[in-house]
Swiss-Prot record:
Listed Gene3D superfamilies: Nucleic acid-binding proteins, P-loop containing nucleotide triphosphate hydrolases, Probable gtpase engc, domain 3
Binding-site residues, Zn(2+): C292, C297, H299, C305
Identification of the protein by name: Small ribosomal subunit biogenesis GTPase RsgA
Key words of the record: Cytoplasm, GTP-binding, Hydrolase, Metal-binding, Nucleotide-binding, Ribosome biogenesis, RNA-binding, rRNA-binding, Zinc
EC numbers on record: 3.6.1.-
Pfam families: RsgA_GTPase (PF03193)
Binding site residues for GTP: N156, K157, I158, D159, G210, Q211, S212, G213, V214, G215, K216, S217, S218
Cofactor(s) required for function per UniProt: Zn(2+)
Top-level enzyme category: hydrolase
Tagged with keyword Membrane: no
Cell compartment(s), UniProt: Cytoplasm
Species per Swiss-Prot/TrEMBL record: Actinobacillus pleuropneumoniae serotype 5b (strain L20)
Amino acid sequence: MSKRRLTQNQQRRIKSNHHKKIAKPELEWQDEMLGEVQQGIVVTRHAKHADVETEQGEIYRCNLRRTLKNVVVGDQVSWRKGNEQLQGISGVIEAIYPRKNELSRPDYYDGIKVMAANIDQIIIVSAVLPTLSLNIIDRYLVICETAKIPALIVLNKIDLLSESERQEVQKQLAIYENIGYETLCLSADTGENMEKLDRYLSRGTSIFVGQSGVGKSSLINQLLPEVNALTGAVSDISGLGQHTTTSSRLYHLPQGGNLIDSPGIREFGLWHLEPEQITLGYREFQSVLGTCKFRDCKHKSDPGCAVREAVEKGEINAIRFENYHRLIESRDETKSQRHFRTEE
């Protein structure tokens, strides 16, 4: 783990914490009870605490300084170990190093919620049952493009398909391959193509996203059998599984790389984004955006719409274009019904 420099504000915060008396010593640390400042990575985030891994691979449960907000899995942090445990807590996180990126989603109660930080790729996990939803894949891809994090589309439970059904699925995935996205069909149950997933995951730090029931926990069980992540039963009625992961956590993979597992998300909303951001989330639109006749073109029936003309010429996939408008409409409907605030 390479050393990283703290900002001046973070250095002042640490120095201030060193000289500040703690009001409740029975609940928090006094300065003389703490060791030297060291660097670590957050591997698990709990409601009031976080587990920090040291450069030596040791993990300590830590309190958070009151001045810190929104510590998440993947954060590189400055922390201090206590001379002894205090009510089961081993140290204190003092500061968060600047993030290279973060994955966020809107929350109906908390505004914009950061899920994880410092991610090298997002693994979008989908499944053939109850149905393969390209609209949901497109929704996640907009998030990936907005966060500027590379994406890999993984289709799980491929063993449940016949040969003809597999060919049809490959045609659907070709829509994404033709615009530069990588895709992978596999089965966590049979192990088909799991070695290919291993190679993708060895690239760096990855995070699984996808609706409940697509088999994220089953994939983790295959990748890390000793973890034995809980596997939720898929509802016979809805086909959607129950949430089985209760805390976000970072795992080190034996073949190299890290994997962040976060609670399943049934709806990854886009209502925190502006329509222009969703438009920019469609990478194949980029070559024609700005060439429409009207600057405020909505890319519907507007005269001289370059995006629609590209669809009619077959240069932009019609299904993706239809999903784009569905996402915009869904965003507008939800936006009018919900109020949210961004975290300061």
